[in-house]
């Protein structure tokens, strides 16, 4: 019985230590990004990308974690005003937490505030230059604004980081075709 308690205690301490360091600065990300680049197929790549997202979503700040969870739930429920209030508080409370900026960027995009979304994506990328989700979002915004060359660049950067990023290849193909047709 004592041995079982020690094992449970060890697992709890290890999990707490992993969570305490989790965010875009987590050392596990370097290994995961290397594994993502070497993934053999989309299934393996998707699994690794999911682990990266899990780490990006972690924060050691309990209040920040609560605001993030509430903001995501409100955004998913299309209560955008409430989500914006929570994400605004979150980026003030945790200004170096990349996923806080990325989630607010996503919300601002959904609210048609493209300039605000781009600003938050830029901040996300300052904090985590490998954020393939933010790069993909930037590509979508640039496509919507008719900035095809900038969109193409963003999608290519995202795909370099995550070769299995859903939709990026199709967007690249469409943008390259559109740019070729313009050149004619």
Predicted segments with their positions:
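Alpha-helical adaptor scaffolds
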Residues: 64-133
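N-terminal leader/linker segments that initiate helical-solenoid repeat arrays
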Residues: 2, 18-69
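Residue-level signature of tetratricopeptide-repeat
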Residues: 70, 104-105, 138, 145, ...
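Terminal, low-structured helical/coil segments at or just beyond the last alpha-helical repeat
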Residues: 27, 38, 47, 54-58, ...
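Register position in tetratricopeptide repeats
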Residues: 76, 110-111, 144-145, 174-181
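Bacterial N-terminal signal peptides
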Residues: 8-15
């Amino acid at each position: 019985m004592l041995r079982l308690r020690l094992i449970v205690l060890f697992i709890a301490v290890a999990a707490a230590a992993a969570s305490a360091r989790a965010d875009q600065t987590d050392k596990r990300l370097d290994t995961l990004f290397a594994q993502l680049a070497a993934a053999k197929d989309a299934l393996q790549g998707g699994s690794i990308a999911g682990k990266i997202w899990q780490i990006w979503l972690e924060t050691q700040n309990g209040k920040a974690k609560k605001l993030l969870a509430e903001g995501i739930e409100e955004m998913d429920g299309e209560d955008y005003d409430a989500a914006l209030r929570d994400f605004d508080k979150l980026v003030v409370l945790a200004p170096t937490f990349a996923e806080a900026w990325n989630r607010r960027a996503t919300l601002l995009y959904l609210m048609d505030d493209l300039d605000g979304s781009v600003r938050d994506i830029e901040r996300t990328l300052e904090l985590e230059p490998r954020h393939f989700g933010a790069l993909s979002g930037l590509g979508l915004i640039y496509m919507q604004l008719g900035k095809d060359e900038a969109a193409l660049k963003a999608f290519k950067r995202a795909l370099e980081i995550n070769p299995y990023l859903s939709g990026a290849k199709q967007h690249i193909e469409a943008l390259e075709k559109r740019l070729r047709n313009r050149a004619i």
